[in-house]
Amino acid sequence: MSLIECKNINRYFGSGENRVHILKDISLSIEKGDFVAIIGQSGSGKSTLMNILGCLDTAGSGSYRIDGIETAKMQPDELAALRRERFGFIFQRYNLLSSLTARDNVALPAVYMGMGGKERSARADKLLQDLGLASKEGNKPGELSGGQQQRVSIARALMNGGEIIFADEPTGALDTASGKNVMEIIRRLHEAGHTVIMVTHDPGIAANANRVIEIRDGEIISDTSKNPEIPASNVGRIQEKASWSFYYDQFVEAFRMSVQAVLAHKMRSLLTMLGIIIGIASVVSVVALGNGSQKKILEDISSMGTNTISIFPGRGFGDRRSGKIKTLTIDDAKIIAKQSYVASATPMTSSGGTLTYRNTDLTASLYGVGEQYFDVRGLKLETGRLFDENDVKEDAQVVVIDQNVKDKLFADSDPLGKTILFRKRPLTVIGVMKKDENAFGNSDVLMLWSPYTTVMHQITGESHTNSITVKIKDNANTRVAEKGLAELLKARHGTEDFFMNNSDSIRQMVESTTGTMKLLISSIALISLVVGGIGVMNIMLVSVTERTKEIGIRMAIGARRGNILQQFLIEAVLICIIGGLVGVGLSAAVSLVFNHFVTDFPMDISAASVIGAVACSTGIGIAFGFMPANKAAKLNPIDALAQD
């Protein structure tokens, strides 16, 4: 059985009236260890035949077998395996990757074989040394002469063993001396047992082969053996290694090439990232603003009392009949305070009237409350003391004032111990509250607090309260407590003539509202991310077009479609991840500036938003990078190699 066997191979280019018959019923066989020169003039079809033999192209009809296996039935990755494991290509124009060193160019086929990094580099160095390039391992193609580049190409062809060497006009771009050197190397490869198939138009070059096949107008016109065949010997073949290092090395190589591609076009890459940067920065900043404002509002709500339920007369806020309902009493507050889930209950009554100190009259609001009211509402004392349980029991004529009252009446003096009149009733100032700055603004209303017994018995003369504030124990469910209080009061009053305001309901409403707003604004900001993703896809399509030749070279040395797909997909994801990280950094910088100048509420960048931003940018890279990457992976090797 012959190593290579072709029967009735035909190849056509074009279609319809422009269809050209390039190869016409080509039949030949090549034995293991042959050195075959295919000679012919330009346009004769010799290069097309070699491309088919090298599995870079496919025949229009006919049979092509390698070791008896029909190649027409092979999938693209199976053909890539042949090129990777058994073939080695020496091109007329060298086809080296300009961004890689000589060592890396030579080692590249072994990446797709799964060879470890150290072993790969050592083998590449040995091949370069054997070809007289030991001192050029770190040089890039642009730093080498034509002859040196071709020797690098030969070393690359041998990296995975190169059982069958395909040489396409190997001396065509070289001077005479370099050409002779290259031909001497090829002859030595043949003598070492490699099967060599060489294409040339020069009879002098063809004379180096032991068999010459001449093609004219797509047909074989002669097939002669000029020299005795050299007995074939086994050529060492590198075995593919399917291990974790196999996938790791391929990923590292793809990542490195992606970084080089991004850095090769810095400005273009930056402009491509711009849409991602703006989108991510917008989303993270909006979420940070939402988090900051939500946190501030919830803190303010907490400062007004957490786990609290306020009970009011009537059916709800704005109920005109609530003023006529007088069933909410001190006894209700006392019964409520005895419930197992209640920490405390404080009634509250209020009265508006004239506040007088010396010759100054002001309009103020006096609130009659229990001694626990301040703790429940989170109000802080600045100076003096708060009234206690005894003050409540004894109807003590004491009062605690707010900062507004202090500023109006005692701007230049200490208010403690002073007597003020409210609705002509004397009250002694025993304490001053701190300014209560919360999300609902700073009221200019003058506020005072006295024991509810004092207000009810000495000022309003009423026996009912305006409200009852209930503090629920920390281990109790406020929803269950609210339901229990409602049933208790309904039983006492005989009707539901009250309504409740649960602080947790306000908290949940704020969280829900701010969450909805964050989602809405983030959705708008996401539009810029989509635009950025389209920009990435556009640039990646341009990159595929620009690097078509590189794709062809990688396929020729054995890259699978998955390898090409992976490389371009990594490049797209890399651009988006870098853009995402820069966007997060930009948002962090904005938040620092914002928090420096704005003190009402901070921008709060959470770890979740950062992780989400990076994940989102990665997803955009995958989503918008897949089409260009898939286009690159589906290129035909010979078509890709033909691009300049």
Curated annotation (Swiss-Prot):
SUPFAM superfamilies per the UniProt record, alphabetical: P-loop containing nucleoside triphosphate hydrolases
Alphabetical list of SMART domains matching this protein: AAA
Main enzyme class? translocase
List its EC numbers: 7.6.2.-
This entry's Gene Ontology molecular function terms read: ATP binding; ATP hydrolysis activity; transmembrane transporter activity
Identify the CDD domains for this entry: ABC_MJ0796_LolCDE_FtsE
Please indicate if the UniProt record lists Lipid metabolism as a keyword: no
Q: Which UniProt keywords apply?
A: Antibiotic resistance, ATP-binding, Cell inner membrane, Cell membrane, Membrane, Nucleotide-binding, Translocase, Transmembrane, Transmembrane helix, Transport
Where does it localize? Cell inner membrane
InterPro entries for this protein: AAA+_ATPase, ABC3_permease_C, ABC_transporter-like_ATP-bd, ABC_transporter-like_CS, MacB-like_ATP-bd, MacB_PCD, Macrolide_Exporter_MacB, P-loop_NTPase
Q: Which residues cross the membrane?
A: 270-290, 524-544, 574-594, 607-627
What membrane topology does this protein have? Multi-pass membrane protein
Q: Where is the ABC transporter domain positioned along the sequence? A: 4-242
Q: Name one Pfam family in it.
A: MacB_PCD
Q: Which residues bind ATP?
A: G40, Q41, S42, G43, S44, G45, K46, S47
Spell out the GO cellular component terms annotated for this protein, sorted alphabetically and separated by semicolons.
Answer: plasma membrane
One biological-process term from Gene Ontology? response to antibiotic
In the record, the note on similarity to other proteins reads: Belongs to the ABC transporter superfamily. Macrolide exporter (TC 3.A.1.122) family.
Function recorded in the entry = Non-canonical ABC transporter that contains transmembrane domains (TMD), which form a pore in the inner membrane, and an ATP-binding domain (NBD), which is responsible for energy generation. Overexpression confers resistance against macrolides.
PANTHER family, alphabetized:
MACROLIDE EXPORT ATP-BINDING_PERMEASE PROTEIN MACB, MEMBRANE COMPONENT OF TRANSPORTER-RELATED
On subunit structure and binding partners, the annotation says: Homodimer.
This protein is called: Macrolide export ATP-binding/permease protein MacB
Native organism: Neisseria gonorrhoeae
